[in-house]
């Protein structure tokens, strides 16, 4: 697309959440014969990083395309237990931790939170002050059912 337009593309909005990690999975599971090593996104994460295109994550609290929110959802007990455990340690909400998980990625991904509720927005903004450790980030990733090599 950049080849055919005058303006440089600087942002790409993509679905990404703790439960929608395809673009992350394929980069972690390189050269393996497992489902999560299949590149279904055309290496978009790596492409955007190389071309200085900011990824904006839409539906950062959703699982699937239209199924619903994973936070406080009975379908994700291990994930919610891990998020709530870290939230309690850091003194913030589970929403702030889910947002911080996206912000912690080295690609400097920007979440699009899509709320009009001022209190929820203030709560989400606390994520920018949370410093998830690498271990916490991977614990959350694994609690969502993702595997590491």
PLM features per residue range, with description:
Residues 1-149:
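Beta/alpha (TIM)-barrel catalytic core signal, keyed to glycine-rich beta->alpha loops juxtaposed to Asp/Glu
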